[in-house]
């Protein structure tokens, strides 16, 4: 399986996840059905944590495939992406609002993603190469 993973173009998985997050963040109404089973107070914050945690873990995956070293810089990069998305939501006039609590959720997701990504991919890539 690792041979297959090494043939994926560099940072393609990260780009795919980033484009999906941009679409979901900047579309006026990406989920028109507000009465789904997943809707509860604070559910949007859970979604932010999952999205940005997934983005950071994907960055770690791509980084480890090439470098096989911890990727702490991605925490800052993904947190900045989250801040930029919230600023764009606030100022683009698309019917969305930027929210400081969303920035916190994005950053928390990035932190969780870096911890999970570093632990998971250290074991996956570094043990195999040793």
Where on the chain are the PLM-derived regions?
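Small-polar-interrupted transmembrane alpha-helices in polytopic inner-membrane proteins
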Residues: 13-25, 73-91
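Interfacial helix-loop-helix junctions of multi-pass membrane proteins
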Residues: 32-36, 85-111
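Short, charged juxtamembrane terminal tails flanking transmembrane helices
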Residues: 124-130
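Membrane-interfacial alpha-helical segments at the cytosolic side of multi-pass membrane proteins
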Residues: 51-65, 109-121
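Membrane-helix interface segments
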Residues: 8-9, 66-73, 96-100
């Amino acid at each position: 399986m690792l041979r297959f993973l090494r043939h994926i173009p560099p940072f393609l998985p990260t780009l795919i996840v980033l484009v999906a997050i941009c679409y979901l963040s900047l579309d006026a109404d990406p989920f028109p059905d507000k009465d789904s089973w997943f809707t509860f107070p604070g559910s949007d914050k859970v979604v932010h944590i999952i999205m940005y945690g997934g983005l950071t873990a994907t960055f770690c995956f791509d980084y480890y495939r090439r470098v096989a070293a911890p990727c702490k810089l991605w925490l800052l990069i993904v947190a900045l992406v989250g801040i930029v998305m919230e600023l764009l939501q606030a100022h683009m006039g698309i019917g969305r609002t930027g929210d400081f609590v969303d920035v916190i959720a994005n950053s928390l997701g990035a932190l969780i993603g870096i911890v999970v990504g570093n632990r998971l991919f250290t074991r996956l890539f570094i043990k195999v190469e040793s």
